[in-house]
Amino acid sequence: MQTINSKSLLRCAVAGLTIVAASAVSFGQNYRNSDDAFLPSPVRSASTVPSNGDVNPYGVAFIKNNFLTGSGLLKHGDILVSNFNNAQNLQGTGTTIVRIPQSGSPSLFFHGNAPLGLSTGLGTLQYGFVLVANLPTADGTSGTAQAGSLLVINNQGQLIQTITSPQIDGPWDMTVVDEGNRASVFFSNALNGTVSRINFSVSPAGLRELSHYTIASGYLHQGDPAALFDAPTGLVFDQNTNRLYVASTLDNAVFIVRDAKSRTTSDGPGDVVYQDNAHLHGALAMAEAPNGHLLVTNNDVINSDPNQPSEIVEFTKWGQFVKEIPVDPNQGGSFGLAVHKVSDDTSILAAVDDNTASITIWTLPLN
């Protein structure tokens, strides 16, 4: 157990949390990287509230090095955050995506026209497109939720396509498999408790749907005044095994759907890989760490525990708990997160805090 893969990504994050105060300007100006340094890199926090006042940050995505930035607003290493609520804090009414640069102040990347509710489903394609799932409501309640759509935004921050499909029914989260001229997008649907896959061809002109399938179904789902929906949410696709990991909030468990990229029929909910009432409190958004572990946030509505607020839980793909850390001292803060491997030695973990409408960014050594 001496390899990098056996170590906890969150171990370094916990250490980083203890020196948040040290990331003030005076420290940052004097900080120098060193291979034998003990102290982790400073923890950074940024507001996700744009000028129109949108709140409740949900989706998180990195602009990777293969993204075609062109002359657009985005730069490699930027972080994007989608907002689900408007300035009146009505769920399913947020219309903005905020850009968090590697240095400098956040700025507005995209402002769409209502009705929109930009959910946790946020991703990118190397052609220079940003994809965001849209689950709008009329008044912030689940009773007025609509089927929604997938928005395709170019690197200039301009909406170029709005895609609807029978396989998009309240898109609560998604994950994107980017293969250049082709892409597969997996959606978790809050309105019917299913997971679907839409295959696209991709060109500079945009996306064209090739086929669509429901590949998993039967997840518990319900409307919830606090969270809008308790439903299947976080998705992680494992290219090596062709398996899709699904975090289902109301089931409070993580499932495996086998043959996810090739199957054309539903596998039911798949098989439970991780169910842990001691650490899971409404399994929500999910990301994969560079060590192969999975990271899942919790909505704190299901199996609530005030002594474990706003946790990110790290566990192995065979269902063994590793570690947990909070993103907020109060319940209800954790939601979207993403991990970006910068180099063989360094990764970045970014996680939103819905309570404070902010994002926390950790730079973590992998060795």
Where are these regions (language model features)?
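Surface-exposed loop and turn segments in beta-propeller and other repeat-based domains
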Residues: 31-53, 102-119, 151-170, 208-227, ...
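Bacterial N-terminal signal peptides
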Residues: 13-23
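Beta-propeller domains
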Residues: 69-70, 83-108, 192, 199-201, 213, 221-268, ...
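Bacterial N-terminal signal peptides that target proteins for export
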Residues: 2-14
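Beta-rich, blade/repeat-based domains predominating
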Residues: 49-76, 91-94, 112-130, 135-137, ...
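Short loop/turn segments immediately following the C-termini of beta-strands
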Residues: 84-86, 134-137, 145, 155, ...
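A short loop-to-beta-strand structural motif that recurs across blades of beta-propeller domains
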Residues: 94-98, 148-151, 193-196, 252-256, ...
